[in-house]
Amino acid sequence: MGRAYQNKKDSMAKTAGAKTKVYSKYGKEIYICAKNGGTDPDGNLSLRRLIERAKKDQVPAHVIDRAIDKAKGGGGEDYVATRYEGYGPGNCMIIVDCLTDNNKRTFADVRVCFTKANAKIGAQNSVSHLFDHLAIFVFDGDDDETVLEALMMADVDVTDVEVENGKVTVFAPHTEYNNTRTALEEMGVTEFDEDLISFVPQIAAPIEGEDVEVMERFLAMLEDCDDVQNVYHNAEF
């Protein structure tokens, strides 16, 4: 699993667009997390760790503070998580995660991207069942057995632990994100090369020729959609 993840990381992982897109993405997520779970990071573990990831991605403090202040004020937009699934160039599988305050607008925007790429939007769970929804942590280390034992002792439902080139990669169900990170921190892990929740494809779909160019345009169009938060796929090129 680890090797497959590493090989596909650049293409299937969440897309990272321009800085403004990254700021907007984190701003929405922080706002929702603070609004639903409380605006004090000390009392909202999910918020604290989301802020840590935002800072690691060089999101300015004023963007973070503005999102939290907005949540403190109440009201504001009511964002809803929406997921679109389907098939792209070369019959690869696509998952598009959005946060929106207007489902009709978001669907229209995403549909335009699919149409221009000659891709097809499918029904819910049409492709996501062929991805593993995982919490992924990568950090320095070379002893996977010790890490696995510590996680099991902490009652973490671990999917896999692998070591390669001096890096430990821990995979766990996405619902185990907080439990896994807490257990790793208690082991003394303080720096993470990767710290995210992602959809990892169970199978790859090699694409070539014109499909590669179309796929690159398709991903760029999705990235330009304001409501799109993350894009995952199994295309290999």
Curated annotation (Swiss-Prot):
InterPro entries per UniProt: Integrase-like_N, TACO1_YebC-like_2nd/3rd_dom, TACO1_YebC_N, Transcrip_reg_TACO1-like, Transcrip_reg_TACO1-like_dom3, YebC-like
Gene3D superfamilies from the UniProt entry: 1.10.10.200, 3.30.70.980
GO molecular function: DNA binding
Subcellular location: Cytoplasm
Transcription found in the keyword field: yes
Disulphide-bonded residues: none
Sorted UniProt keywords: Cytoplasm, DNA-binding, Transcription, Transcription regulation
Entry's Gene Ontology cellular component terms: cytosol
Principal location: cytoplasm
Any one biological process term the GO annotation gives: regulation of DNA-templated transcription
Highest taxon of source: Bacteria
UniProt record similarity statement: Belongs to the TACO1 family.
Name of the protein this chain belongs to: Probable transcriptional regulatory protein PSHAa1370
Species of the source: Pseudoalteromonas translucida (strain TAC 125)
Lineage, opening ranks: Bacteria, Pseudomonadati, Pseudomonadota, Gammaproteobacteria, Alteromonadales
